[in-house]
Amino acid sequence: MMRHQAGLSGLRGATQQDLLDHVVMEERLAAAVPGRLLGKSAYHALTFGWLMSGLARAVTGKDMRLLFREELAEPLDTDGLHLGRPPADAPTRVAEIIMPQDIAANAVLTCAMRRLAHRFSGGFRSMYFPGAIAAVQGEAPLLDAEIPAANGVATARALARMYGAIANGGEIDGIRFLSRELVTGLTRNRRQVLPDRNLLVPLNFHLGYHGMPIGNVMPGFGHVGLGGSIGWTDPETGVAFALVHNRLLSPLVMTDHAGFVGIYHLIRQAAAQARKRGYQPVTPFGAPYSEPGAAAG
């Protein structure tokens, strides 16, 4: 499942109402029959989140929104990691989404997208659902749902802190976040050469993270998020970074993806220089972990 080989990447028949109800989606996927790509890498763009949350709920009895706070934000002592819209009294706020706020409904385009998703493109079908644009317009109802693969809300510093712990053997600022054994396991088995059946490029999915199929230009692993935000880590060099922005369903997504390569190159250069001259202390911006119901500071 964490290699995107469950054969359940498609979203045929799911309505916008279904997709905004995580329990419904977990139940639908639990009852679904795996498709022909079972056992083959086929990016589960949206269904991956409900597969994971359904499993987590069965094991822990807790939903993924709570697990984000208890297993990520709290041990890392940061408020900037949420699933969905942060509570009104949380220090973290959702930035205004720039795109596609002003895109008008287009019946022809909607019909074409639905047919494309249904009949031809496995990759597009794994990401598309009716009403996708409306879900991120206005007050963005998508943020009030529990969609673990698509509606995480994070600050760049908090996301980089999580990946930084992985880059540093599972520890950051004296906090043990993951065991060294688990971090070692994350770095293994990343030599996939066959292309992903949905995205048509080899992404080396392993334990939920993917690599980047461009030689050694972006060593390490991480994950690109909805709209083109990204978190990345390279335990071999101890480098990690995160880039987040407030664009969704934007034509600039591919530009963002290409930009990661250049940004990462500059970060690696800066890290190498810092190792030679010594590290400089950085002001600890960003709110620490906030207990539910605590007043925003």
Where in this protein do the model-derived segments appear?
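Extended amphipathic alpha-helical segments with heptad-repeat/coiled-coil character used for oligomerization
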Residues: 82-83
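Short Gly/charged-rich anion-binding patches and loops
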Residues: 24, 51, 68
